[in-house]
């Protein structure tokens, strides 16, 4: 006997039955044949309903697990000091991004546009830490890329596709997970073109990289080799859709404040109605950056198409001395807490006096390294102590004060007083 693909018997008198529900070919509209089995249209519809319900349940659980903007902000506050405006902007943008993914799964009529994020702020102000904390909170794959190493395809350097390669490595090549991850591209200001006008020569690490990043950030299907590189052309490439990957770009944008100030004071610069530019009105860099407009970024050297694909702009302020002291002591993984833990493992208490914390903050401000330089300073003043301590006995406490930071004095070591030997009771032999 032979059957066609619809399950109709080519031999008369032979009735076929659905292998799942047992109904005959006369009781259903369609019977589909498989290898030695049949399935009717009713069972197919039932299977579709089951799958649809499971997908809806999965979407609901994802929605319930997605933290609200206020909850995101509370977690960011535990790790990042200050920068309240930037944290609020990020919390809302990330929440809306993952709501957008949910709406795409439902096939809603209204398609929500992708909102990638641009972080603008001085070095050491917390841009990278914000992105890392977000990824940890949302439990999604996260990778970082350095824009200065990227070049156009075909030139020496990293291709932009390598960014997706790194993201895949973070989630063990699970394409579904990678397609909902977060990518942080640092030093994005370093790929600005050299002048505001389009270049007639090839700029493979500046404007060329911006052009290469356009489709990746907006949403495209990137072909990525499973094991990286192009050494094995016979390998089957993985197809990764980037339309649901959140891209966060960050940069210090040194000199952008001058571009903004030039724009804001450019109106009426000649004649009786001219605004007088006073040198006394020197604003803080952070406050100036908060007034950034897309036109300022274009004038700085980003191409208009690239700026258009980063609609959410969050600016970070320069950290002052009180903020740096808080960074040293308050976050969950504060630097002083980390070193105290290291000393605790040697059964030694570590104390930082308030004047020492102020001195560390002042030194970081002087070096213009922001929060990133705090660890370097603490590491350098405690290096010799950490070298000698494991070999020393009876040390109970190490104290760091201002003189240790400012004058490179040795930290104070407090020793345990040896216990007095027990005296024998009177009359004992």
Curated annotation (Swiss-Prot):
A Pfam entry, by short name:
zf-C4_ClpX
The record's Gene3D superfamilies line, in alphabetical order, gives: 1.10.8.60, ClpX chaperone, C4-type zinc finger domain, P-loop containing nucleotide triphosphate hydrolases
Q: Where does Zn(2+) bind?
A: 18, 21, 40, 43
Stated name of the protein: ATP-dependent Clp protease ATP-binding subunit ClpX
Q: Which organism is it from?
A: Stenotrophomonas maltophilia (strain K279a)
Q: Enumerate the UniProt keywords alphabetically.
A: ATP-binding, Chaperone, Metal-binding, Nucleotide-binding, Zinc
Domain annotation ClpX-type ZB: ranges: 6-59
Its biological purpose is as follows: ATP-dependent specificity component of the Clp protease. It directs the protease to specific substrates. Can perform chaperone functions in the absence of ClpP.
User: What biological-process terms (Gene Ontology) are attached?
Assistant: cell division; proteolysis involved in protein catabolic process
Family matches, as SUPFAM superfamilies:
Glucocorticoid receptor-like (DNA-binding domain), P-loop containing nucleoside triphosphate hydrolases
GO cellular component annotations of the record: HslUV protease complex
Q: Which proteins does it associate with, and in what oligomeric form?
A: Component of the ClpX-ClpP complex. Forms a hexameric ring that, in the presence of ATP, binds to fourteen ClpP subunits assembled into a disk-like structure with a central cavity, resembling the structure of eukaryotic proteasomes.
**Tell me, what is one Gene Ontology molecular-function annotation carried by this entry?**
ATP hydrolysis activity
State the family named in the UniProt similarity comment for this chain.
Belongs to the ClpX chaperone family.
This protein's source sits in the domain of life called Bacteria
């Amino acid at each position: 006997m032979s059957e066609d693909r619809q399950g109709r018997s080519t031999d008369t008198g032979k009735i076929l039955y659905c292998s799942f529900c047992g109904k005959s070919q006369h009781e259903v509209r369609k019977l589909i044949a498989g290898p030695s089995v049949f399935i009717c249209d009713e069972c197919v519809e039932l299977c579709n309903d089951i799958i649809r319900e499971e997908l809806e349940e999965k979407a609901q659980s994802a929605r319930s697990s997605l933290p609200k903007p206020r909850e995101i902000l509370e977690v960011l506050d535990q790790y990042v000091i200050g920068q309240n405006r930037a944290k609020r902007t990020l919390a809302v943008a990330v929440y809306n991004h993952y709501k957008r993914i949910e709406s795409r799964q439902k096939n809603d009529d209204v398609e929500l546009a992708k909102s990638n994020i641009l972080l603008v702020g001085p070095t050491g102000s917390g841009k990278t830490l914000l992105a890392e904390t977000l990824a940890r909170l949302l439990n999604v794959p996260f990778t970082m890329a350095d824009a200065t190493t990227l070049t156009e395809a075909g030139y020496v350097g990293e291709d932009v596709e390598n960014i997706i390669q790194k993201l895949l490595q973070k989630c063990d090549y699970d394409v579904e997970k990678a397609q909902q991850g977060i990518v942080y591209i640092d030093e994005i200001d370093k790929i600005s073109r050299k002048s505001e006008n389009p270049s007639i020569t090839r700029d493979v690490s500046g404007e060329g990289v911006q052009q290469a990043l356009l489709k990746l950030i907006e949403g495209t299907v990137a072909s990525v080799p499973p094991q990286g590189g192009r050494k094995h052309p016979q390998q089957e490439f993985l197809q990764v859709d980037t339309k649901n990957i959140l891209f966060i770009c960050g940069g210090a944008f040194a000199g952008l404040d001058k571009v903004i100030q030039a724009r804001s004071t450019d109106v009426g610069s000649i004649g009786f109605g001219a605004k007088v530019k006073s040198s006394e009105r020197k604003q803080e860099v952070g406050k100036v950056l908060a007034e950034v407009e897309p036109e300022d970024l274009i004038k700085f050297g980003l191409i208009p198409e690239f700026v258009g694909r980063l609609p959410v702009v969050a600016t970070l302020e320069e950290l002052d001395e009180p903020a740096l002291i808080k960074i040293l002591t308050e976050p969950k993984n504060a630097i002083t807490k980390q070193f105290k833990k290291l000393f605790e493992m040697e059964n030694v208490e570590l104390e930082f006096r308030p004047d020492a914390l102020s001195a560390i903050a002042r030194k970081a401000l002087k070096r213009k390294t922001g929060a990133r330089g705090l660890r370097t300073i603490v590491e350098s003043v405690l290096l010799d102590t950490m070298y000698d301590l494991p070999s020393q006995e009876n040390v109970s406490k190490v104290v760091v004060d201002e003189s240790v930071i400012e004058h490179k004095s040795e930290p104070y070591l407090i020793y345990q007083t040896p216990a007095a030997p027990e005296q024998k009771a009177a009359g004992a032999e």
